[in-house]
Design a protein with these regions (language model features):
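Intrinsically disordered, metal-sensing/regulatory segments
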Residues: 1-262
């Protein structure tokens, strides 16, 4: 159980470390740097969705023969629809590279800062679920999930959480909030990951046979975030290939981690 708890906290540590950048850097991240970091995060999430979630989901359903894809197919779509629903219900704000704000979700009287944090929190939910379901598979003896593979996913999510923590804390500081407050708000945006990770472990204990569905559910939710949010963000502004290059770096790094440790 100690291994599970540590694994669930590793991604949160990445967010915390990234938010701490507000104490070391003196100004807001440049648009090119933001595109690079967003592309990197997208690459990690796509690779994690494929190698750590969808592939194990299909492998665990091999008893179905040629229909082994069905649990992964169904879980993937449930994940997409779940995030689509949250995206339309939770009031949140997307900040573009050109500093314009795009409000999504139900109308509310929430402050701009809260909605910005909710935007990051929204896509931290599937990341926490992804780590939680993999560690649940490890805990309940899924043959296709190893301790190394679970650690690889946790480390990969932590690595891509580092820039996310910086991207939330530094703009808040640039807008006039104190460094400590900006840091803690950045940390708060990542606190949902261990919470949803723990909840996923508990849910999985009740429905162990549904593990392939849970794995692909997390993958669908993560890929929704990539396509709906991260890819558009890394492509904003003047034409640049920096986002694509760092997407490839993030993808290859996560793939290497999964194969080497898994």
């Amino acid at each position: 159980m100690k291994t599970i708890i540590i694994g669930l906290l590793i991604p949160f540590a990445g967010t915390t470390a990234g938010a701490a950048c507000v104490f070391a850097l003196k100004k807001e991240l440049e648009s090119g740097v933001q595109r690079a970091l967003t592309g990197f995060a997208a690459g990690v999430m796509v690779a994690a969705s494929i190698w750590s979630l969808i592939v194990p989901a299909i492998e665990q359903s091999d008893r179905l023969g040629r229909f082994a894809f069905l649990p992964a197919f169904a879980g993937f779509w449930f994940g997409i629809l779940f995030l689509l629903a949250l995206d339309h219900v939770i009031p949140h704000l997307h900040r573009s590279i050109d500093q314009t704000d795009q409000v999504e979700g139900l109308k509310s009287g929430l402050s701009r800062t809260i909605m910005l944090i909710l935007a990051v929190t929204l896509h931290n939910i599937p990341e926490g679920m992804a780590v939680g379901v993999v560690y649940a598979g490890l805990l309940y003896g899924s043959a296709n999930i190893t301790a190394g593979g679970a650690l690889a996913l946790a480390l990969g999510i932590a690595i891509q959480n580092f820039p996310e923590g910086a991207i939330i804390s530094m703009p808040l500081y640039a807008e006039g909030k104190s460094k400590p407050k900006s840091f803690w708000l950045g940390v708060l945006s990542g606190a949902v990951e261990p919470v949803f990770g723990g909840l996923t472990v508990l849910v999985a204990s009740l429905v162990v046979p549904a593990m392939p569905y849970l794995l692909s559910f997390a993958a669908g939710a993560m890929l929704y975030v990539v396509v709906e949010e991260l890819i558009p963000e890394m492509s904003e502004g003047e034409h640049s290939n920096i986002g694509v290059i760092f997407f490839a770096i993030g993808f290859s790094l996560m793939m290497a981690l999964d194969v080497a440790l898994g």
